[in-house]
Amino acid sequence: MNISKVRIATLSIGLAVGSMALQSCDSLTKTQKGAGIGAAAGGVVGALIGKKAGNTAVGALIGGAIGGTAGAFIGRRMDRQAAEIQKAIPNAEVIREGEGIIVKFDSGILFDFDKTALKDAAKTNVQSLAASLNQYPDTDIKVIGHTDSRGTEVYNQGLSERRAAAVKAYAVSQGVPSSRLVTIGKGFAEPIADNETDAGRAANRRVEIVIVANDALKSTAQKQG
């Protein structure tokens, strides 16, 4: 599976009239898009990426962006890391936009149905991801668990939390500092597909790992300009 390419709209400022209009920027690199993302454009980015990931993941991606030259510096690092993750874990979906990365696993890749223990094959995937996180230590990570809508809200909330915790625990066992990882369970609150179909429910059962620059990397990036 290739790195997901999400079309982004960015801000174009008309200096003569002081007005702003949205335009497509497919010709820009991911890094250039990261440099141009501001508050208004971020909302458009969120709407587009949100078709592939939940609101919590998208919010973390946009909320961590600083834009400008510093954002471009961070974007170049994220370009490299995203490509390496996709090569190492071809069955994951890697969404690379702006100044961050979302790595998405269908829950069937990681867990048996209704279970929270990682499959043996899944441990290899998380081990590969942990190796990348250790290679790029100046990032913060959110691990977000999601379920489909079958079952009660309370049960699914707990299931999503336990699955996120299982991914974190294995990453920590592979040397990733626990302090870098935050787990979040969203139950069935953030579907990305129709829960009325088997395919939709399968898409909604997922774990999203969001990778963004930490404060140290942002500080380094801001000094580059």
Label each PLM-derived region with a short phrase:
Residues 26-84:
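Short, low-complexity, glycine-enriched hydrophobic/amphipathic alpha-helices that associate
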Residues 78-105, 109:
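Amphipathic, membrane-active segments
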Residues 47, 51, 72, 76, ...:
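Structured segments of extracytoplasmic/periplasmic soluble domains
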